[in-house]
Amino acid sequence: MYPGSGNYSYNNRPSMPPPGFNGDGQGYRQEYGNQYGGGYQQQQYQDQYQGENRGQYQGQYQDQPEYGRPPSGMVRPPSSIQQGNGQQFQYSQMTGRRKALLIGINYIGSKNALRGCINDAHNIFNYLTTYCGYRPEDIVMLTDDQREMVKIPLKENIIRAMQWLVKDAQPNDALFFHYSGHGGQTKDLDGDEEDGMDDVIYPVDFESVGPLIDDTMHDIMVKSLPQGARLTALFDSCHSGTVLDLPYTYSTKGVIKEPNMWKDVGSDGIQAAMAYATGNRSALFSSIGNMVSSVTKKQNVDRERVRQIKFSPADVIMLSGSKDNQTSADTFADGQNIGAMSHAFISVMTRQPQQSYLSLLQNLRNELAGKYSQKPQLSASHPIDVNLQFIM
Protein backbone atom coordinates (compact mmCIF):
# COMPACT_ATOMS: atom_id res chain seq x y z
CA MET A 1 0.00 0.00 0.00
CA TYR A 2 1.34 3.40 -0.93
CA PRO A 3 1.16 6.56 1.18
CA GLY A 4 -2.08 8.43 0.77
CA SER A 5 -4.04 5.41 -0.44
CA GLY A 6 -5.89 4.62 2.76
CA ASN A 7 -4.64 3.07 5.98
CA TYR A 8 -1.28 4.49 6.92
CA SER A 9 0.57 2.00 9.08
CA TYR A 10 3.77 0.11 8.27
CA ASN A 11 3.58 0.87 4.57
CA ASN A 12 6.65 1.24 2.41
CA ARG A 13 7.78 4.50 0.94
CA PRO A 14 7.71 4.29 -2.87
CA SER A 15 11.09 4.50 -4.57
CA MET A 16 10.19 7.78 -6.23
CA PRO A 17 7.19 10.06 -6.58
CA PRO A 18 5.13 9.45 -9.73
CA PRO A 19 5.02 11.78 -12.75
CA GLY A 20 2.74 14.73 -12.22
CA PHE A 21 3.95 15.78 -8.79
CA ASN A 22 3.58 19.53 -8.44
CA GLY A 23 3.75 20.22 -4.74
CA ASP A 24 0.62 21.96 -3.55
CA GLY A 25 -1.05 21.63 -6.93
CA GLN A 26 0.46 24.82 -8.29
CA GLY A 27 4.13 23.89 -8.31
CA TYR A 28 7.06 25.73 -6.75
CA ARG A 29 8.31 28.93 -8.30
CA GLN A 30 11.88 28.77 -9.56
CA GLU A 31 12.84 32.38 -8.79
CA TYR A 32 14.99 31.43 -5.80
CA GLY A 33 18.51 31.47 -7.15
CA ASN A 34 19.36 35.04 -6.25
CA GLN A 35 18.16 34.84 -2.65
CA TYR A 36 21.49 33.46 -1.50
CA GLY A 37 23.57 36.42 -2.60
CA GLY A 38 26.43 34.10 -3.43
CA GLY A 39 26.59 32.48 -0.01
CA TYR A 40 24.57 30.50 2.50
CA GLN A 41 23.82 32.91 5.32
CA GLN A 42 23.36 31.30 8.71
CA GLN A 43 21.32 34.18 10.13
CA GLN A 44 18.45 33.29 7.80
CA TYR A 45 17.78 30.27 9.98
CA GLN A 46 18.36 31.47 13.52
CA ASP A 47 14.67 31.88 14.33
CA GLN A 48 13.19 29.13 12.18
CA TYR A 49 12.53 26.71 15.05
CA GLN A 50 11.82 28.71 18.15
CA GLY A 51 8.93 29.24 20.53
CA GLU A 52 6.05 26.82 20.83
CA ASN A 53 7.25 24.34 18.20
CA ARG A 54 10.53 23.73 19.99
CA GLY A 55 10.09 21.09 22.63
CA GLN A 56 6.85 19.77 21.11
CA TYR A 57 8.38 16.32 20.90
CA GLN A 58 10.38 16.35 24.13
CA GLY A 59 9.94 13.48 26.52
CA GLN A 60 8.42 10.88 24.23
CA TYR A 61 11.54 8.68 24.22
CA GLN A 62 12.69 9.15 27.80
CA ASP A 63 10.64 6.60 29.77
CA GLN A 64 11.16 3.53 27.60
CA PRO A 65 13.08 0.46 28.78
CA GLU A 66 16.83 0.47 28.29
CA TYR A 67 18.92 -2.00 26.35
CA GLY A 68 21.54 -4.10 28.05
CA ARG A 69 24.70 -2.66 29.49
CA PRO A 70 27.12 -0.91 27.14
CA PRO A 71 29.72 -3.24 25.61
CA SER A 72 32.55 -3.96 28.03
CA GLY A 73 35.92 -2.42 27.27
CA MET A 74 34.40 0.25 25.02
CA VAL A 75 36.72 3.24 24.55
CA ARG A 76 36.51 6.52 22.72
CA PRO A 77 38.12 6.80 19.28
CA PRO A 78 41.87 7.56 19.42
CA SER A 79 43.12 11.03 18.56
CA SER A 80 46.22 9.86 16.72
CA ILE A 81 46.46 9.47 12.96
CA GLN A 82 45.45 5.98 11.81
CA GLN A 83 46.42 3.84 8.83
CA GLY A 84 43.89 2.00 6.69
CA ASN A 85 44.01 0.53 3.21
CA GLY A 86 47.41 2.15 2.71
CA GLN A 87 46.09 5.63 3.51
CA GLN A 88 45.92 7.88 6.55
CA PHE A 89 42.77 8.98 8.35
CA GLN A 90 41.83 10.41 11.72
CA TYR A 91 38.87 9.96 14.06
CA SER A 92 37.20 13.17 15.19
CA GLN A 93 37.25 13.94 18.93
CA MET A 94 34.05 16.02 18.56
CA THR A 95 35.54 18.94 20.49
CA GLY A 96 35.09 21.53 17.74
CA ARG A 97 32.10 23.29 16.25
CA ARG A 98 28.77 21.52 15.87
CA LYS A 99 26.56 22.09 12.81
CA ALA A 100 23.61 20.16 11.43
CA LEU A 101 21.46 20.05 8.30
CA LEU A 102 18.04 18.38 8.60
CA ILE A 103 15.82 17.73 5.58
CA GLY A 104 12.26 16.41 5.77
CA ILE A 105 10.10 16.19 2.65
CA ASN A 106 6.45 15.11 2.75
CA TYR A 107 5.82 15.96 -0.94
CA ILE A 108 2.71 17.84 0.15
CA GLY A 109 -0.16 17.60 -2.33
CA SER A 110 1.35 14.80 -4.43
CA LYS A 111 -0.23 11.40 -5.02
CA ASN A 112 2.68 9.74 -3.25
CA ALA A 113 2.84 12.15 -0.34
CA LEU A 114 4.54 11.03 2.85
CA ARG A 115 3.31 11.97 6.30
CA GLY A 116 6.22 11.47 8.66
CA CYS A 117 9.27 13.12 7.12
CA ILE A 118 8.74 16.64 8.45
CA ASN A 119 8.09 15.17 11.90
CA ASP A 120 11.36 13.25 11.56
CA ALA A 121 13.29 16.47 10.95
CA HIS A 122 11.75 18.14 14.02
CA ASN A 123 12.35 15.07 16.18
CA ILE A 124 16.00 14.90 15.15
CA PHE A 125 16.30 18.64 15.88
CA ASN A 126 14.95 18.05 19.36
CA TYR A 127 17.31 15.11 19.94
CA LEU A 128 20.39 17.03 18.80
CA THR A 129 19.63 20.12 20.88
CA THR A 130 18.53 18.19 23.97
CA TYR A 131 21.13 15.41 24.13
CA CYS A 132 24.04 16.22 21.83
CA GLY A 133 25.00 19.84 22.46
CA TYR A 134 23.92 21.29 19.12
CA ARG A 135 22.71 24.90 19.26
CA PRO A 136 19.51 25.83 17.38
CA GLU A 137 21.33 28.64 15.57
CA ASP A 138 23.79 26.08 14.15
CA ILE A 139 21.08 23.90 12.64
CA VAL A 140 19.51 24.42 9.22
CA MET A 141 16.18 22.74 8.55
CA LEU A 142 14.61 22.38 5.09
CA THR A 143 11.00 21.16 4.96
CA ASP A 144 8.30 21.54 2.34
CA ASP A 145 5.80 23.14 4.71
CA GLN A 146 7.91 26.30 4.95
CA ARG A 147 6.66 29.64 3.63
CA GLU A 148 10.07 31.09 2.79
CA MET A 149 11.42 29.82 -0.53
CA VAL A 150 14.96 29.53 0.81
CA LYS A 151 13.81 27.00 3.43
CA ILE A 152 12.00 24.69 0.97
CA PRO A 153 13.99 21.55 -0.01
CA LEU A 154 14.42 22.43 -3.67
CA LYS A 155 17.45 20.82 -5.28
CA GLU A 156 19.43 24.06 -5.37
CA ASN A 157 18.58 24.80 -1.75
CA ILE A 158 19.65 21.31 -0.67
CA ILE A 159 22.97 21.59 -2.51
CA ARG A 160 23.73 25.00 -1.02
CA ALA A 161 22.73 23.80 2.43
CA MET A 162 25.13 20.86 2.05
CA GLN A 163 27.86 23.29 1.05
CA TRP A 164 27.08 25.42 4.11
CA LEU A 165 27.30 22.35 6.35
CA VAL A 166 30.87 21.49 5.38
CA LYS A 167 32.16 25.02 4.73
CA ASP A 168 35.26 25.87 6.78
CA ALA A 169 35.14 22.51 8.58
CA GLN A 170 38.10 21.83 10.86
CA PRO A 171 39.54 18.71 12.51
CA ASN A 172 37.41 17.57 15.47
CA ASP A 173 34.29 19.39 14.24
CA ALA A 174 31.02 17.46 14.57
CA LEU A 175 28.67 17.77 11.61
CA PHE A 176 25.33 16.01 11.34
CA PHE A 177 23.17 15.42 8.25
CA HIS A 178 19.68 13.95 8.25
CA TYR A 179 17.41 13.23 5.28
CA SER A 180 13.90 11.82 5.44
CA GLY A 181 12.01 11.52 2.16
CA HIS A 182 11.80 9.61 -1.09
CA GLY A 183 14.86 7.75 -2.36
CA GLY A 184 15.50 5.72 -5.48
CA GLN A 185 18.05 4.54 -8.00
CA THR A 186 19.24 5.55 -11.45
CA LYS A 187 21.75 4.06 -13.88
CA ASP A 188 25.37 4.44 -12.78
CA LEU A 189 27.44 6.31 -15.36
CA ASP A 190 30.91 6.33 -13.79
CA GLY A 191 31.37 2.65 -12.91
CA ASP A 192 31.65 3.06 -9.15
CA GLU A 193 28.59 1.02 -8.18
CA GLU A 194 28.65 -2.77 -7.79
CA ASP A 195 24.97 -3.05 -8.68
CA GLY A 196 25.29 -0.71 -11.67
CA MET A 197 22.94 1.81 -10.06
CA ASP A 198 23.46 5.17 -8.35
CA ASP A 199 21.38 5.89 -5.27
CA VAL A 200 19.45 9.15 -5.32
CA ILE A 201 17.24 11.36 -3.17
CA TYR A 202 14.33 13.38 -4.52
CA PRO A 203 13.99 17.11 -3.84
CA VAL A 204 10.51 18.58 -4.18
CA ASP A 205 11.34 19.95 -7.66
CA PHE A 206 12.90 16.73 -8.99
CA GLU A 207 10.65 16.63 -12.05
CA SER A 208 12.13 19.83 -13.44
CA VAL A 209 15.72 19.54 -12.20
CA GLY A 210 16.17 15.80 -11.56
CA PRO A 211 17.14 13.88 -8.42
CA LEU A 212 20.28 14.41 -6.37
CA ILE A 213 22.65 11.49 -6.98
CA ASP A 214 25.08 9.87 -4.56
CA ASP A 215 28.16 10.98 -6.52
CA THR A 216 27.20 14.63 -6.06
CA MET A 217 26.48 14.23 -2.35
CA HIS A 218 29.80 12.43 -1.87
CA ASP A 219 31.71 15.19 -3.66
CA ILE A 220 30.08 17.92 -1.56
CA MET A 221 29.90 16.39 1.90
CA VAL A 222 32.69 13.79 1.98
CA LYS A 223 35.49 14.78 -0.38
CA SER A 224 35.62 18.35 0.86
CA LEU A 225 36.12 17.48 4.54
CA PRO A 226 39.59 17.71 6.09
CA GLN A 227 41.25 14.90 8.00
CA GLY A 228 39.73 14.50 11.45
CA ALA A 229 36.46 16.31 10.74
CA ARG A 230 33.37 14.23 11.50
CA LEU A 231 30.19 13.95 9.47
CA THR A 232 27.46 11.70 10.84
CA ALA A 233 24.78 11.10 8.21
CA LEU A 234 21.38 9.53 8.83
CA PHE A 235 19.28 8.61 5.79
CA ASP A 236 15.66 7.52 6.22
CA SER A 237 14.80 6.73 2.61
CA CYS A 238 14.48 3.83 0.19
CA HIS A 239 17.55 2.36 -1.53
CA SER A 240 19.86 4.28 0.80
CA GLY A 241 22.45 1.64 1.64
CA THR A 242 25.31 3.35 -0.20
CA VAL A 243 23.74 6.76 -0.82
CA LEU A 244 26.90 8.62 0.27
CA ASP A 245 29.21 6.28 -1.66
CA LEU A 246 31.23 5.37 1.42
CA PRO A 247 33.58 2.46 0.66
CA TYR A 248 33.29 0.42 3.89
CA THR A 249 30.02 -1.21 4.93
CA TYR A 250 29.86 -3.29 8.11
CA SER A 251 27.82 -6.33 9.04
CA THR A 252 26.21 -6.98 12.41
CA LYS A 253 29.17 -9.28 13.12
CA GLY A 254 31.51 -6.32 12.87
CA VAL A 255 33.26 -7.27 9.65
CA ILE A 256 33.41 -5.47 6.33
CA LYS A 257 30.69 -6.76 4.05
CA GLU A 258 31.68 -8.19 0.70
CA PRO A 259 28.96 -8.30 -1.95
CA ASN A 260 27.38 -11.62 -2.87
CA MET A 261 27.30 -11.44 -6.65
CA TRP A 262 24.21 -13.65 -6.89
CA LYS A 263 22.32 -12.39 -3.86
CA ASP A 264 20.38 -9.60 -5.53
CA VAL A 265 19.28 -11.27 -8.78
CA GLY A 266 15.92 -11.41 -7.01
CA SER A 267 12.98 -11.19 -9.41
CA ASP A 268 15.00 -12.48 -12.37
CA GLY A 269 15.74 -15.67 -10.45
CA ILE A 270 12.08 -16.12 -9.57
CA GLN A 271 11.04 -15.51 -13.17
CA ALA A 272 13.60 -18.04 -14.39
CA ALA A 273 12.26 -20.66 -12.00
CA MET A 274 8.67 -20.01 -13.07
CA ALA A 275 9.61 -20.15 -16.74
CA TYR A 276 11.39 -23.47 -16.20
CA ALA A 277 8.38 -24.90 -14.34
CA THR A 278 5.97 -23.89 -17.11
CA GLY A 279 8.23 -24.89 -19.98
CA ASN A 280 8.48 -21.32 -21.30
CA ARG A 281 11.95 -21.53 -22.86
CA SER A 282 11.92 -17.99 -24.24
CA ALA A 283 11.18 -16.46 -20.84
CA LEU A 284 13.70 -18.82 -19.22
CA PHE A 285 16.56 -17.69 -21.47
CA SER A 286 15.57 -14.03 -21.04
CA SER A 287 15.58 -14.28 -17.24
CA ILE A 288 18.89 -16.14 -17.16
CA GLY A 289 20.37 -13.48 -19.45
CA ASN A 290 19.26 -10.74 -17.07
CA MET A 291 20.77 -12.61 -14.12
CA VAL A 292 24.12 -13.04 -15.87
CA SER A 293 24.10 -9.38 -16.91
CA SER A 294 23.48 -8.29 -13.32
CA VAL A 295 26.30 -10.42 -11.96
CA THR A 296 28.69 -9.35 -14.73
CA LYS A 297 28.10 -5.69 -13.95
CA LYS A 298 29.04 -6.28 -10.33
CA GLN A 299 32.14 -8.26 -11.26
CA ASN A 300 33.29 -5.49 -13.60
CA VAL A 301 33.58 -3.05 -10.71
CA ASP A 302 37.10 -3.05 -9.30
CA ARG A 303 36.26 -2.97 -5.61
CA GLU A 304 39.70 -1.88 -4.47
CA ARG A 305 39.80 0.88 -7.09
CA VAL A 306 36.47 2.18 -5.83
CA ARG A 307 37.68 2.07 -2.23
CA GLN A 308 40.72 4.10 -3.16
CA ILE A 309 38.59 6.66 -4.98
CA LYS A 310 35.91 6.94 -2.30
CA PHE A 311 38.27 6.77 0.69
CA SER A 312 38.37 9.92 2.82
CA PRO A 313 40.80 10.93 5.59
CA ALA A 314 37.83 12.63 7.27
CA ASP A 315 35.71 10.74 9.78
CA VAL A 316 32.46 10.10 7.90
CA ILE A 317 29.89 7.68 9.30
CA MET A 318 26.55 6.90 7.67
CA LEU A 319 23.53 5.11 9.08
CA SER A 320 20.92 4.30 6.47
CA GLY A 321 17.45 2.86 6.82
CA SER A 322 17.72 0.12 4.22
CA LYS A 323 19.91 -1.76 1.80
CA ASP A 324 20.28 -0.48 -1.77
CA ASN A 325 17.57 -2.91 -2.91
CA GLN A 326 15.11 -2.23 -0.06
CA THR A 327 12.40 0.27 0.73
CA SER A 328 12.05 2.15 4.02
CA ALA A 329 8.86 2.29 6.05
CA ASP A 330 6.73 5.32 6.83
CA THR A 331 4.62 4.53 9.88
CA PHE A 332 2.82 5.79 13.00
CA ALA A 333 4.20 5.71 16.54
CA ASP A 334 4.12 7.80 19.70
CA GLY A 335 1.04 9.61 18.45
CA GLN A 336 2.54 10.88 15.20
CA ASN A 337 3.51 9.84 11.69
CA ILE A 338 7.23 9.11 11.50
CA GLY A 339 9.89 7.33 9.48
CA ALA A 340 10.83 4.00 11.01
CA MET A 341 14.60 4.56 10.81
CA SER A 342 14.55 8.08 12.27
CA HIS A 343 12.36 6.91 15.13
CA ALA A 344 14.54 3.85 15.76
CA PHE A 345 17.71 5.94 15.89
CA ILE A 346 16.31 8.34 18.48
CA SER A 347 14.82 5.50 20.52
CA VAL A 348 18.03 3.48 20.59
CA MET A 349 20.28 6.43 21.42
CA THR A 350 18.07 7.86 24.17
CA ARG A 351 17.59 4.49 25.86
CA GLN A 352 21.31 3.73 25.79
CA PRO A 353 23.50 6.76 25.01
CA GLN A 354 26.70 4.73 25.47
CA GLN A 355 26.94 2.67 22.28
CA SER A 356 29.70 1.18 20.23
CA TYR A 357 29.37 1.35 16.46
CA LEU A 358 28.56 -2.34 16.44
CA SER A 359 26.01 -2.27 19.25
CA LEU A 360 24.29 0.71 17.61
CA LEU A 361 23.90 -1.20 14.34
CA GLN A 362 22.70 -4.31 16.15
CA ASN A 363 20.21 -2.36 18.27
CA LEU A 364 18.85 -0.53 15.23
CA ARG A 365 18.33 -3.88 13.50
CA ASN A 366 16.60 -5.27 16.59
CA GLU A 367 14.42 -2.18 16.94
CA LEU A 368 13.00 -2.68 13.44
CA ALA A 369 13.00 -6.49 13.33
CA GLY A 370 9.56 -8.07 13.29
CA LYS A 371 7.86 -4.86 12.17
CA TYR A 372 9.66 -4.06 8.94
CA SER A 373 11.67 -5.89 6.30
CA GLN A 374 14.25 -3.11 5.98
CA LYS A 375 17.71 -3.61 7.49
CA PRO A 376 19.66 -0.55 8.66
CA GLN A 377 23.19 -0.23 7.29
CA LEU A 378 26.42 1.17 8.76
CA SER A 379 29.12 2.47 6.44
CA ALA A 380 32.23 4.62 6.75
CA SER A 381 34.73 6.60 4.70
CA HIS A 382 37.63 4.64 6.20
CA PRO A 383 38.07 1.36 8.09
CA ILE A 384 36.68 1.67 11.63
CA ASP A 385 37.06 -0.27 14.83
CA VAL A 386 33.40 -1.11 15.41
CA ASN A 387 34.04 -1.69 19.13
CA LEU A 388 34.93 1.97 19.69
CA GLN A 389 32.35 4.26 21.25
CA PHE A 390 29.95 5.92 18.82
CA ILE A 391 30.01 9.65 19.53
CA MET A 392 28.37 12.51 17.68
UniProtKB/Swiss-Prot annotation:
The lineage of its organism: Eukaryota, Fungi, Dikarya, Ascomycota, Saccharomycotina. It is an enzyme of class 3 (hydrolase). One of its GO terms (molecular function) is calcium-dependent cysteine-type endopeptidase activity. Residues 1-14, 53-63 have a biased composition (Polar residues). Keywords: Apoptosis, Hydrolase, Protease, Thiol protease, Zymogen. Disulfide bonds: none annotated. GO terms for cellular component: cytosol; nucleus. Belongs to the peptidase C14B family. GO terms for biological process: apoptotic process; protein quality control for misfolded or incompletely synthesized proteins. SUPFAM superfamilies: Caspase-like. Residues 1-87 are annotated as: Disordered. The active site is at H182, C238. This is Metacaspase-1. InterPro entries: Caspase-like_dom_sf, Metacaspase, Pept_C14_caspase. It comes from Candida glabrata (strain ATCC 2001 / BCRC 20586 / JCM 3761 / NBRC 0622 / NRRL Y-65 / CBS 138). Involved in cell death (apoptosis). Residues 41-51 have a biased composition (Low complexity). Its EC number is 3.4.22.-.
